[in-house]
Amino acid sequence: MNLDNLNSLIELFFYQSDKQNKKSIFLQWLNPNKQITYTWGETQKSILKLSKTIKKNIKEGDRCLLVSENRPEWFISDLAIMLSGGITVPAYTTYTEEDYKYLIEDCEPSLVIVSNNEMLRKLSNTINQKNFIKKVITLDEVNKVLDNQDSVNKEKYLDFNTLLKIDLLEEDKFQNNKLKRTSPACIIYTSGTGGNPKGVVLSHGGILNNLVGACEIMKPLFNSRPVFLTWLPLSHSYEHCVQFAQIAVGAKVFYAEKIEKLLENISEAKPTIMTAVPRFYQNLYNKININLKKQTGFKAKLIDATLRLGKKKLLNQKMSFSEKLLNLIVNQLVRKKIKKQFGGNLKAFVSGGGALDKEIGEFMNSIGLPTLQGYGLTETSPVVSCNPIHKIKVETVGPPFKGNQVKIAEDGEILVKGENVMLGYWNKKEETQKVIIDGWLHTGDIGEIDSEDGYLKITDRKKDIIISAGGDNISPAKIENMITNEPEIDQCMVYGDKKNYLVALIVPSKDFLKEKEKINNVIEKINKKLTLLEKIKRIQLIKENFSIENGLMTPTMKVKRKKVTEKYKDQLENLY
């Protein structure tokens, strides 16, 4: 299959599903209350049946809002919308009623697909007010909410499972040849770390272009049918693209029940490959590290050898005969056991959605969990570059994908050009023109390109850089990573724009909530590794975690600096 020759993501799906065994399981939800599985054949039929209804209720180019947790029906809905000539607008389930109102008023969907009662409650008021919404398809029974609707509004609602019971006629089995590589596939709203989200319009060709690079990365990782465990929100561009990579490689896909059950789900699914964001690896690093540090005697020596030799191998440093022998021993006694905790079949983690700390990257790779750091943003469909398994450089985000042009502007900003670049921001022509100049997308990230092998390195986010009172540029991300790598500290945010020194908001780990002296000692230890300008002079401990629920983190677990600063402005200013 040559991805460059395909016109649409729909063409990709039908090409792959026609090749697969129709009875082979393709999609499976690991929810004990809803044991849902779809074979390749059932998935194809379900997409065609759902599309039959959608086509009657939308025109070509109409937007369709999709609000659901990760589950097989998410996949089916997304493909059915595109097959019908619609544009999928995925939305996070963590949004508030106001967030949904903003999205609906901005993209004006003709159709809404929503998962359950809980999510529909947040949408129903806006749905009832908007005449442009023709139909609402519910994945689960939602009688509780519908009981309060008048008869006119009740007619808007259709049940997903009922729609799948309709008969397919020969003319319903079509593949929509009108779609082109330049056709919009989806509008993904950037969660953003401040301000209203912007709708990023991505094309079929942009995502297909991304898949060429993704398949190159995955090719050396497996020689049989790969298994994926999907747990990051499918409404995020990162996991949304992974969904199409799963089609391209003919994978078996498991959907995690929920984040709290992730480790159990990993044991059950035994994934070959997993995608995650830096916060996941940081939590993993702290948990594994705490357990490793408890070991004494011979076990402690084995762990030390695992980390030391793993790092040597990662850096392609020469090993003596005795080191090679010891490395084989720790492979069996240490790395194999760690790998078993992740199902035993894991070939690689792929990290994206933010910068992965170098120390964590080295640690993960050294203990036998290969971790490939990539880089991208919603506006680039989303991947720009990724480390290949045969040559990992943890301090970088790897070489650019085929078809992506990358250059560094005079001020250090990373610029990207290629088919993967978005078509633009929905309804925001001026905003689009500000970031795409002469075909080059201005990413807002600061970086450099390694002259030796063309690997890209991200040094900071342009808008996050702190400029001190003396005009010096300081990277908060570097300092924050060093602080949160310590087991005593769960989260932090560094502050100090236009100030004489830096301060930090610290959320201690639960075992250290009342241990201010120990936290101070940790900061003192870190300060010894920092330059005079980077040192943290004062700290403020807070008990409440930054979370998606309290609006202080994005759905991919990045701290919303603007919101945190607004909430804790007085405490921060009192540190000066």
Residue ranges and their predicted role:
Residues V112, I408, G418, L423-G424, ...:
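AMP-binding/adenylate-forming catalytic core of the ANL superfamily
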